[in-house]
Amino acid sequence: MARKAPDQDAGEALRRFKSDLKAGTLGNFYIISGEEAFLRSHYVDLITKKIADGPAGEFNCHRFSADDCTPQALADAIDAMPMMAERTLVRVDDVDLFKQPEGAREQYAAIFSDLPDYCCVLFVYDTVEFKINGTMKKLAAAIREHAQILTFGKQSERDLCAWITRHFRAHDKMVTDELCQYLIFRTDGLMTTLAGEIDKIAAYQQGPAITRGAIDAVVIPALSA
């Protein structure tokens, strides 16, 4: 059987994740990365609300950064039983697992290989790039076997046009596909940037139809535009 390309695997991982999120059957280990910060933030928020949004939400949600995350601290948080809820959430931001000392890497590998069903561990990467280092075999194997890796990259022009149209519609504005493409060209094409520009354009534009003049008036062109 031919081996699947990385983008196929990534697409399948995202489809599975979205299906599990909708069904309320989230797994217990996710790694979220990619340059599209808007989507990263969106889905991290949805996971958090799904798992730790009850009356004891703060108690059931544990968060670490590179400054305070250690194997022992992570293990203690994972071992903490949920209060007035079915599950707990442990979020770790921007910790490069493969740059940890060998002893810590082995401890992390052991932790990831024995996660309880009541806990969802979420590693989120924003300022640090996530990349598996295959030379560190134990940790790499544990992540590949147990983690669902979700990469939110730059969206296609087609998907962005549909998304831009929906967001203008929320402002009671109409926009053509041609102007959606122009707005993408004028910006860096990232949804975080586009969301802010859409709000500005909608506030500036008089009448229901977005015009090129309104885009030119308020959008500061990206250096690459």
Tell what function each PLM region has.
Residues 1-225:
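Conserved beta/loop motifs at nucleotide-recognition and modification sites
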